[in-house]
Amino acid sequence: MDEDEFELQPQEPNSFFDGIGADATHMDGDQIVVEIQEAVFVSNIVDSDIAVHNFVPDDPDSVVIQDVIEDVVIEEDVQCSDILEEADVSENVIIPEQVLDSDVTEEVSLPHCTVPDDVLASDITSTSMSMPEHVLTSESMHVCDIEHVEHMVHDSVVEAEIITDPLTSDIVSEEVLVADCAPEAIIDASGISVDQQDNDKASCEDYLMISLDDAGKIEHDGSTGVTIDAESEMDPCKVDSTCPEVIKVYIFKADPGEDDLGGTVDIVESEPENDHGVELLDQNSSIRVPREKMVYMTVNDSQQEDEDLNVAEIADEVYMEVIVGEEDAAVAAAAAAVHEQQIDEDEMKTFVPIAWAAAYGNNSDGIENRNGTASALLHIDESAGLGRLAKQKPKKKRRPDSRQYQTAIIIGPDGHPLTVYPCMICGKKFKSRGFLKRHMKNHPEHLAKKKYHCTDCDYTTNKKISLHNHLESHKLTSKAEKAIECDECGKHFSHAGALFTHKMVHKEKGANKMHKCKFCEYETAEQGLLNRHLLAVHSKNFPHICVECGKGFRHPSELKKHMRIHTGEKPYQCQYCEYRSADSSNLKTHIKTKHSKEMPLKCDICLLTFSDTKEVQQHTLVHQESKTHQCLHCDHKSSNSSDLKRHVISVHTKDYPHKCEMCEKGFHRPSELKKHVAVHKGKKMHQCRHCDFKIADPFVLSRHILSVHTKDLPFRCKRCRKGFRQQNELKKHMKTHSGRKVYQCEYCEYSTTDASGFKRHVISIHTKDYPHRCEYCKKGFRRPSEKNQHIMRHHKEVGLP
């Protein structure tokens, strides 16, 4: 076996140091056996020293350091005398120590191991480590008094794979992380020097935090090739009535600009409700004392940034498990009281986990070391000075309420934002949350599903306790006794209460369902509206349905009479005048009121009869006025220029001469403008920042900016990806994909799926025919309402037929 290599023999329980230095003092019959209790990362290190202080065993002739991890055999002999002499070991060994009854001081000089003569009685307070590289080692050691000293390594807990390359001694780095359960057991690494070849070079720094938790693992794919798995189980109490203590080492990222990132967080005896308490057996009593510890330190590698330990590759659950056992609780408590006065609570660190730090940008205030180098100091203390930190439970973040709705900001007056509630599915905005909630019923497929589902029925809930109570109700009833059956799904229940609850689930599911009419394409989210539609349109009392508007009638004659409204047909004509009507009853009323014998006065021109002479005189004025104003675009004639102008503007032009001063909206007639201005009274106007457009409604202003001043097309069709500026344009476009017949106007961009609406559009907008004509002056109108308004204004003395 070479001098600079270790031979790993996992099946060998004991390891002996056979090689004896020339200056070593021999003791007949005595032999040192070392048992190490955690995985050790070993590499070739030159000129590194480890000093362990204040080790005074009860029996100086017997020292046992136990371990239950790996079988490592180092064939070197170490001789001992009544007083430990200096021994040379030609191997690179790092052995962290744990002190139970007393402090331990040991100095290991690499490539040789030296134990000074006065190490047992001295009280040395400083040690030095010289390590150019870094190795993470989670160690836990305890010393037992036996006659023979054996170095034993077991692999019952952690399987460690150690790869040592003798040809590349500068690649694998070493650094020791010791989890020591003794109150004052501190490996002081203030003398550790880290060689920095370039001060301006950024370094990889990380926190290592140890906390008590379940077993875990470390997987490292770096040059060291180390894999540690700690998922196997361990007996919490050993044979000698001591219980081990499990400590985890977590890695936290640090700021590379800090000089000293080492530190300690100590947690005193945990409360009963703490889940991370570890029971330690007090040697003076049989009571188990639960305690907790968290330890962190830094890993600073300035020489091997790319080849050495790559902390960014380590997952969030990475840790090293340290087992600590056989500790004197009384000595620990006494030492903790002394050490409590020495701890500076102001030097406490804050930790940032890897999952929260995407880069090495987390600042942490470090403690300046004595020699200015990065500190590898690791403390595990039982003091209560920082105990209140552990008792402060972190505040739980409140889970966002599922009933909360997201808000958005739109442009308001003078650039001030206005909060609205947008629909995240179709983009429509609402002024209040209630309107948005009502609108969301139109998107039942996108409503949030409940988190917890019952496996026995359709019950769902967002609360875990509600599901638990519901499952308990299932346990009270036997499935064999279920006799009541649900009419909708066929499930059986034992009593009516369970069936009622089950039907509420069906009702809840149906609340978000779109209700579609069976006889036409009408659909709505509310059942009441569908019932009203069925009663008014498709009821058995109204079996005769109009194909144009869907209105129902009791008799075919009523439907035939109704269809004349859509066709404009007027088959009934007055025999005394040119009056025509679509309904015979209207014609009878006309004759009775206009051509009755009870009205002796009759017009000589139109043969209309009147009961009073004044009425006849006013009527004759209509015939006397000469209509000299002829429209250039049609056959319309007006008695004055104002009427002709009004006709041309409203019929033959798209200009709107009457403009609103507030919003610049145009109208054909002054009366329409007057009605519009009344809307603006008492409302604050919102000015567009890009033009002079003003509007009282901020939603209209938002649509104006999207349609006029932006080139973006935020509303896109999911099928053909065509973009639109406004939601209503997209809605019209979606009708082309629905499979329904679309009526497209050949004169403009108007389109609709309603045949009657399309017909009204063509007649009222793009034709010169005006089917609704005045009986007195033969003036035509697009709609009957316009004709009635005309008669009330100009033929008030005659009255409506």
UniProtKB/Swiss-Prot annotation:
Top-level taxonomic group: Eukaryota
GO molecular function terms attached to this record: DNA-binding transcription factor activity, RNA polymerase II-specific; sequence-specific DNA binding; zinc ion binding
Keyword set includes Phosphoprotein: yes
Zn finger limits (C2H2-type): 421-443, 452-474, 484-506, 515-538, 544-566, 572-595, 601-623, 629-652, 658-680, 686-709, 715-737, 743-766, 772-795
Residues making up the signal peptide according to the UniProt record: none
Family matches, as Pfam families: zf-C2H2 (PF00096), zf-H2C2_5 (PF13909), Zfx_Zfy_act (PF04704)
SMART domains: ZnF_C2H2
GO terms for cellular component: nucleolus; nucleoplasm; nucleus
GO biological process, any: regulation of transcription by RNA polymerase II
Keywords linked to the UniProt accession: Activator, DNA-binding, Metal-binding, Nucleus, Phosphoprotein, Repeat, Transcription, Transcription regulation, Zinc, Zinc-finger
UniProt comment concerning the protein's domains: The binding of ZFY to DNA is mediated by the interaction of the GGCC core base pairs with zinc fingers 12 and 13.
Function: Probable transcriptional activator. Binds to the consensus sequence 5'-AGGCCY-3'.
Family in the record: Belongs to the krueppel C2H2-type zinc-finger protein family. ZFX/ZFY subfamily.
Protein name per its UniProtKB record: Zinc finger Y-chromosomal protein
Organism name: Pan troglodytes (Chimpanzee)
Recorded name of the encoding gene: ZFY
